[in-house]
Amino acid sequence: MEIIFYHPTFNAAWWVNALEKALPHARVREWKVGDNNPADYALVWQPPVEMLAGRRLKAVFVLGAGVDAILSKLNAHPEMLDASIPLFRLEDTGMGLQMQEYAVSQVLHWFRRFDDYQALKNQALWKPLPEYTREEFSVGIMGAGVLGAKVAESLQAWGFPLRCWSRSRKSWPGVESYVGREELRAFLNQTRVLINLLPNTAQTVGIINSELLDQLPDGAYVLNLARGVHVQEADLLAALDSGKLKGAMLDVFSQEPLPQESPLWRHPRVAMTPHIAAVTRPAEAIDYISRTITQLEKGEPVTGQVDRARGY
């Protein structure tokens, strides 16, 4: 079995060594320009067109949970990868736990009004504030995939009313499920904290805009953990300035790194992190990839395959 690996920043030697230990019968090599030798599987992130073009691969693994970048490249260069070759994304591989940590910590931060207390501290004001009640602090999750399910599971223990919005109906215990555009308004109307975990598709670009934000309760919060292109940043800022939104926590942006001139840097009710909510953890990624390749070789059913038509 031949496996080729390409990532512009990862330590290729470490990955090659780890994969060969996990798959003793495989020969793994770092792909370099000019390497046209046969391969059965490819592990990639931002691969050049020539790496995959013309290869008769059994499968391609994308070294991340998001596949929008490679799908966009495949649309621009259809010769890059035959449509019959399955494409896999990393399914959880530690990202679920990271998303749980991030989402729970931020929801609790807002629920306990730590943002308000920080503002009071900046004014040197000692002023206990009324508490919020859990019943009025409904959390709505847009996107009900693997990561959305993990976040909902982690928030259940804290007793917040939970709801999710997705393409298909979910039957998660303790979570109200809303489906499609026809139920979006009902989902938003009672959502105090909106958590975005949607995939990046043509249908979801710019979805968090003024029309959507206007349907949230006054004083709502937005937590974006998915993609920056989901948010119309000017609309978000306008909602913050008007008081419609009380706060926003952003891990992703329409342009990264975020330009220094962006008003998001200076807005007092915007907090941010530099796209670190859930990063690839190599050891867990190796475990998932080696396990999935073994299942594929045995003809067993696998999970994590990308639906190219849907975009995730």
Swiss-Prot record:
Keyword NAD: yes
Record field: catalytic activity: glycolate + NADP(+) = glyoxylate + NADPH + H(+); (R)-glycerate + NAD(+) = 3-hydroxypyruvate + NADH + H(+); (R)-glycerate + NADP(+) = 3-hydroxypyruvate + NADPH + H(+)
Predominant localisation class: cytoplasm
UniProt superkingdom: Bacteria
Catalytic residues in the record: R227, H275 (proton donor)
Cellular component GO terms held in the UniProt record: cytosol
Keyword list, A-Z: Cytoplasm, NAD, NADP, Oxidoreductase
Annotated EC: 1.1.1.79, 1.1.1.81
Subcellular locations according to the entry: Cytoplasm
Function: Catalyzes the NADPH-dependent reduction of glyoxylate and hydroxypyruvate into glycolate and glycerate, respectively.
NCBIfam families in the record: PRK15469.1
Classification via PANTHER family: 2-HACID_DH_C DOMAIN-CONTAINING PROTEIN, D-ISOMER SPECIFIC 2-HYDROXYACID DEHYDROGENASE NAD-BINDING DOMAIN-CONTAINING PROTEIN
Family: Belongs to the D-isomer specific 2-hydroxyacid dehydrogenase family. GhrA subfamily.
Protein name: Glyoxylate/hydroxypyruvate reductase A
